[in-house]
Amino acid sequence: MSLTAWSWTFLVGYVGLMVGIGVYAKQRIKHADDFATARGAYGPVFLALAFAASTASGATFLGSPAMSYEWGLSTVWLHFLYPIGVYVGILISMRLVATSGNRFGNRSIPEYLGDRYQSDAMRLMVSLLSLVLFFYLAGQLVSGVVMFEIMLGLDSSWALGITALVLLVYVVLGGAHADILTDGVQGAMMLALAILVICLVALGWGVDGGFAGIVDDLEQQDPVLVAPINPNTSLFHSWWSIFVIAFAHLPLGLLPHLGNKLWALDTSKSRFQFVKLAALFGLALGMLGLGGLLARVYFGDALYADGANPNQALPLLFIELFPTWLAALIGVGVLSAVMSTADGLVVSSSQIIANDIYRRTLAPKMHPNLSQQELDGRVLSISRWSTVGVLVICAVMAWSLMDVNVSLVVWIGVGGMMAAFAGPLVLGALWRGVTLKGAYSGLLSGFTVFIIIHSQILEPEWFIGVGLDGAVAWLRGEGPNPYSCAVMGEIVSVSVTFIVSKLTQPLPEAHLQALFSEAQQSTGGAS
């Protein structure tokens, strides 16, 4: 059979499996909290697979190999350091977030922050800020469309419709249970492909001299491709750009679509095992980008030609190396990466509407006399309808951004929130002295600094009179590097949070004692 025929065969099987899991997950939904968090329902191994799959996105199969194809060995820093940053961030933060979130009965990261700082306004502010993740979800849908077009020969409208419809069916049915169950299965498939790619590169498959032959070939094409830093890209052009990779990703695992999975872990005693396994799986998935090095050896600079694209590096490598049926599996791998990130975004976004806005804000004012059972039923219904609304909105956004480079827009959402969360969420998990005003200040300052630097709106000539034109020129040069911008935003967020907290009214001691003593007891019990 042809590549298209095999791709269709695998697609039908994949869609059937995802929908089947959604139907099964629906049976596990007893109330709204099940839909939102699947609290305490999964062990560390399966949840680690699901978490690692959600952390990876369509870029893991397309963008990361493309960077290795274009920039060579300097990109290994990214593949290795970003998973380390993510899981170190989880390790230092999850003690308080998981323990307190379970005690409060939180269903979202915005709700957790509202309870952590005893502020409805904080919850609403973070909820509204989280809406920028719609751009991230739209970007995932676009990645799915690209894969359908390449592997199945579909036009954009059909590709977008199928991607959104599959997501809609299984998430509406099973909520967080469907999210985690499908992500665990998809994570296992992605991990198998990652191990295959790592072995291919390590052995230098089909290249004389093995891995050393890959390095020699890259050096012959361009010596910069084997240098530890690459001056041709702002992502890896200096040791600063390498340093920021791990630190930029520290808050990533606590963004709303990932952080809510921490509450699905079955027991606090499994936390360290969960983090170790998720880090191991995440590191393996990160190494998928190495496939771009082998693709550069096989194809040279052919993917720069008209009609080609470096994003095709890994799919074309599979087509080159393997039988048609096996090459078609890369399409399922990319689709798994897209769906495993997108479904978490859909669930967390629906909870902004159903939980953070309706249950915690509107319902107490509009329906104060509702019983808990009636309220729960309404929240569950709103969760499902919100899922439909979120997907429709993001599909429209994806359609409008189809011919646009969405990386800047996506990173305004992801990088901006990572910068914003560094103070109130990460520092707030380590230091009991963070105040409400400190959290507000850190949240807004980190987000604002990221946007200002990443959008490159500052002009050096504006600052010649005060002698800062050189510093501003450097900041402007760092603008295209989202990791550098995120770290600078995170530094500002943490610094402002600390300074303002030192100068403002602390939270009640009884509240802090309950938060941190319980987290410490939980850690002690798990050791």
Residue spans of the language-model regions?
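Membrane-embedded helix-loop-helix hairpins and adjacent transmembrane boundary segments
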Residues: 1-527
